[in-house]
């Protein structure tokens, strides 16, 4: 699926889904690079909740394969937003071991136009993404190689990773170039 073949998965809040071409190979490259990262590789960590940092920030050059994910994500974001030019893309890793959750939050801190997530590793029962639209809740089960895009002001969280494996995703925000 490419940027022009986006699927809207929940029409009331404009949540879109897309897939990364050759995701299996890209994800393997990212996971191999991730295994070699040290705390010094992260330029910033945020949201220390329940004993872990929920967001880990690093430079694109520190993780092989991530550039392909971000380039494809930006193409999808431009298609969703109807924005022909380049966008600013901020990104971070969300690393969830067994028992970890990610707390409810939004991404509307600055001038974000669209938020997204890409799943690198998501074993069965590793935690659904839960979206809150007023009284409605929607649970989306992550799948490696899948992107989900949604409004930055949409409250969301990740349920507990009940698998014994690692759940690794890349969070993203897109906004205008300054």
Where are these regions (language model features)?
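Non-heme Fe(II)/2-oxoglutarate
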Residues: 1-84
């Amino acid at each position: 699926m490419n940027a022009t073949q986006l699927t809207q998965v929940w029409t009331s809040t404009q949540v879109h889904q897309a897939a990364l071409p050759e995701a299996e190979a890209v994800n393997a490259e990212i996971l191999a690079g991730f295994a070699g990262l040290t705390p010094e590789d992260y330029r910033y960590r945020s949201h220390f909740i329940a004993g872990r940092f929920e967001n880990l920030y690093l430079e694109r050059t520190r993780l092989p394969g991530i550039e392909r994910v971000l380039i494809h994500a930006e193409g999808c974001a431009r298609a969703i937003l109807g924005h022909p030019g380049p966008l600013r893309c901020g990104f971070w890793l969300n690393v969830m071991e067994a028992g970890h959750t990610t707390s409810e939050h939004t991404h509307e801190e600055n001038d974000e136009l669209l938020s997204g997530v890409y799943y690198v590793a998501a074993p069965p029962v590793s935690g659904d993404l839960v979206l809150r639209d007023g009284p409605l809740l929607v649970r989306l089960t992550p799948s490696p190689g899948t992107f989900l895009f949604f409004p930055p002001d949409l409250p969301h969280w990740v349920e507990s990773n009940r698998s014994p494996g690692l759940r690794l995703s890349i969070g993203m925000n897109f906004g205008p170039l300054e």
